[in-house]
Curated annotation (Swiss-Prot):
Entry-linked SUPFAM superfamilies: Cytochrome c
Superkingdom as given in the UniProt entry: Bacteria
Protein name: Cytochrome c homolog
Gene Ontology MF term list: electron transfer activity; heme binding; metal ion binding
PANTHER family: CYTOCHROME C
Length: 175
């Protein structure tokens, strides 16, 4: 291959690149992209709660937690709480799994297990896990503490939540 042939090959590559660029510019001039985003379907506006107090108020307005606690069944709560054992331990000095251990959770300060790394959403809550706070959290964790790393969707039936809370209260005394 001589110098002339090499020059012809390089010139052909440069010329082809130039043609491709020119065609691209012309295409952009002729065909303007649609910059308007179309929203398909019907969207429903959802009002998100920004604080745990409003989530607690919403939970308290819709159900009377103390009345539910009077009729709560700890044995039924034990069955429902089996879902929790996938990510939590119930043992007194049990290991922290995906979530912190739940030993003596009722009445315990929030984010108080020192060897567990809580999400920022839970760390900033403050207060204690009483019946009302546990009820609101177990009903829908993502509404109670937006940004929590707990991926559990929640327990939909209010009586089931009361049963779980009673089970957690009694579990400490049964051991």
């Amino acid at each position: 291959m001589t110098g002339k042939e090499l020059n012809k090959i390089v010139a052909a590559i440069l010329f082809a690149s130039l043609i491709a660029m020119i065609v691209g510019f012309i295409a952009n001039i002729l065909y303007k992209p649609n910059l308007h985003v179309l929203h398909r379907g019907y969207s429903i506006a959802i009002q998100k709660s920004s604080s745990n107090e409003s989530a607690t108020v919403i939970a308290q307005e819709s159900v009377n937690i103390q009345e539910l606690m009077k009729t709560a069944n700890a044995n039924h709560g034990r069955e429902i709480a089996k879902k929790c054992l996938m990510c939590h331990s119930l043992d007194k000095d049990g290991p922290n799994k995906l979530g912190p251990h739940l030993w003596n959770i009722v009445g315990r300060p929030k984010a108080s297990i020192t060897d567990y790394k809580y999400s920022f959403a839970i760390s900033k809550l403050g207060g204690v896990w009483d019946d009302e706070n546990l009820f609101a959290f177990l009903h829908k964790p993502s509404s109670y503490a937006p940004g929590t790393k707990m991926s559990f969707a929640g327990i939909s039936k209010p009586q089931d939540i009361a049963d779980v809370i009673l089970f957690l209260k009694n579990y400490v005394h049964d051991q």
